[in-house]
Design a protein with these regions (language model features):
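Transmembrane-helix bundle of Major Facilitator Superfamily
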Residues: 2-202, 341, 346, 354, ...
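Transmembrane-helix exit segments and adjacent C-terminal regions of multi-pass membrane proteins
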Residues: 2-36, 42, 282, 456-519
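Flexible interhelical linker loops that connect adjacent transmembrane helices
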Residues: 21-23, 149, 195-224, 266-284, ...
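Transmembrane core module of solute transporters
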Residues: 27-77, 81, 181, 218, ...
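Small-residue-rich transmembrane alpha-helices and their cytosolic helix-loop interfaces
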Residues: 38, 74, 153-166, 216, ...
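C-terminal module of multi-pass small-molecule transporters
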Residues: 92-101, 117-119, 137-138, 146-152, ...
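C-terminal membrane-cytosol helix-exit motif in multi-pass small-molecule transporters
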Residues: 151, 190-208, 224-235, 253-268, ...
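A membrane-interface helix-boundary motif in multi-pass transporters
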Residues: 178-190, 236-247, 315, 436-481
């Protein structure tokens, strides 16, 4: 099979050479194709939440069954992101993209026709395998087909599709459930998957590293177990308590296994994850910034969704609609190219600083303007969305451009893992702050807000409980704002330092070249 000029490009970003001077001639069409594949996966992340009441009635499912229906997907997907990215680099990104779509489609078919909770849980796990392949290969293909100058905008559109899927999931699910039975939320994926497979086969170019390196099977197993244990601890924390034996054991297992993974990756000649990436100043700064952006966004949405449902009394669908402005702001700024233009004018360090400052301002707005009703929340969501639109694509591009092109799949796996980790960390940390504040104000029945409200003997007691929860929400969001702002300043400073170092290195190379030419 012949390779295109884009596939023969050097390892490093084109800013350092002549690679990728021209993008793939059909790159924008290909971006639309891979975004269609991406949207299929992301819709499924939130669409199931709306179907929970119907599933509970139809299958007589227990609370544990429902939790596993939701969590099986995210556990498998999160655990396999690094492995999926490595597989895409090794066996071809187009091939793995098609495999991911097929697995996701088969899982959707089995889920839609499932007659028992166990079968549905297994199908959701299978969909998670396909989802991991899709999330990593799509970003790797974006880096392959676009020029260095176009990559930030392309990544912005790719990220906007992520937000669109998150916002549209409850709407699509609600529409389908109003007209069809619960299986429709899964079977609707099938025509989209079929269209995406045909389009990928026709338009997406193949790429990958076919150097014959031995697969890192031990690393794949360790990373999968470690990340799944970490995500399980984060998922279980809000329900079972962060100090419970279940959560502590899962977290301890994650630390031990991921430590063993890092040790193993250092010892072998062809690691799944090259830890030398973390010596790159730009890569390290972007990693920290991306974790903090998803920390603020994930934690805020988790807390705000509970506040809207338990305190203000909105149903799941309406609560989802009221948080949608954040995602829609991301979509608007990235699809129109406004965020990319701002970033190009300001440069990466300032873009990240501005993005994190906007996010922090949004968290403060939600925390302090609750007495103004939904207006303060809406302002905060728009600010968080604007900050995410400006900062997140810049950091994703910085991560991906710091990694050799032959390892783009691994870079996409790192990017996806950081998103999952940051969001989970936000839920864990900000949730713990809220619970501590809530327990201090309502010590008798502070195990959970629903339990406290159910045990309330009067309207006055209910008002005291909701007031305590609001106070806890304010405290946790302010803590998140401080963390995001400080993290943004540090990430911007580190990126600025990395830029200065790159310029100095370039000047040194130029000076040596001139000196060599004169001798």
């Amino acid at each position: 099979m012949t390779t295109s000029p884009q596939e023969q490009a050097p390892d490093r970003p084109p800013a350092r050479g002549a690679a990728q001077s021209q993008g793939h001639p059909r790159r924008w069409l290909i971006l639309g194709v891979i975004c269609l594949a991406q949207l299929t996966v992301l819709l499924d992340n939130t669409v199931l939440n709306v179907a929970i009441p119907s599933l509970t009635r139809a299958m007589d499912a227990s609370t544990a069954d429902i939790q596993w229906m939701i969590n099986a997907y995210s556990l498998v997907q999160s655990g396999l992101l690094l492995t999926a990215g490595n597989a895409a680099d090794r066996y071809g990104r187009k091939r793995m993209l098609i495999v991911g779509l097929v697995l996701f489609g088969v899982g959707s078919l089995v889920a839609g026709l499932a007659e028992s909770p166990g079968r549905l849980i297994a199908a959701r796990a299978g969909m998670g395998v396909g989802g991991a392949l899709l999330l990593t290969t799509t970003l790797a293909v974006v880096m392959q087909i676009f020029t260095h100058e176009e990559q930030p905008r392309a990544i912005g559109i790719w990220a906007a599709v992520n937000s669109l899927g998150f916002a549209a999931g409850p709407l699509v699910g609600g529409f389908l459930l109003n007209h069809y039975w619960w299986g429709a939320v899964f079977l609707v994926n099938l025509p989209v998957v079929a269209l995406a497979v045909a389009a990928v086969a026709a338009y997406v170019p193949e790429s990958g590293n076919r150097l014959g390196e031995r697969p890192d099977l031990v690393g794949a197993v360790l990373s999968t177990i470690g990340m799944a244990s970490l995500v399980y601890a984060i998922i279980s924390g809000p329900e079972h308590g962060w100090t419970s034996a279940r959560v502590a054991a899962s977290a301890a297992s994650a630390v031990l296994v991921l430590g063993a993974f890092a040790y193993w990756e250092r010892r072998i000649p062809h690691p799944m994850l090259d830890l030398d990436f973390f010596r790159n100043r730009r890569f390290t700064a972007s990693v920290g910034g991306l974790v903090l952006i998803t920390f603020g966004m994930g934690g805020a949405l988790f807390l705000l969704t509970q506040y809207l449902q338990f305190v203000l009394g909105y149903g799941p669908l309406e609560a989802g609609l009221r948080t949608a402005p954040m995602a829609l702001t991301v979509v608007a700024l990235n699809f129109t190219g406004v965020a990319a233009k701002w970033s190009a004018r300001m440069g990466s360090p300032r873009s990240i600083g501005l993005g994190m400052a906007l996010m922090a301002a949004g968290l403060v707005s939600i925390a302090t303007l609750t007495e103004h009703g939904y207006t303060g929340t809406l302002l905060g969501l728009v600010l968080i969305g604007a900050g995410t639109a400006v900062g997140s694509p810049v950091m994703s591009h910085a991560i991906m451009s710091s990694i050799p092109r032959e390892k783009a799949g691994a870079g996409a796996g790192i990017n996806g893992t950081l998103n999952e980790f940051g969001a989970g960390l936000g839920v864990a940390v900000l949730g713990a702050v809220l619970n501590a504040r809530f327990a201090a104000l309502v010590p008798v029945v502070a195990s959970s807000l629903p339990a406290a409200l159910a045990a309330a003997g009067s309207e006055r007691e209910r008002a005291r409980i909701t007031g305590a929860y609001s106070s806890g929400l304010e405290t946790s969001l302010l803590v998140g704002a401080v963390a995001v702002l400080l993290g943004g300043l540090i990430a911007a400073a580190l990126l600025h330092r990395a830029d200065r170092g790159d310029r100095a290195d370039g000047e040194d190379r130029a000076d040596r070249g001139e000196s060599g030419g004169r001798t």
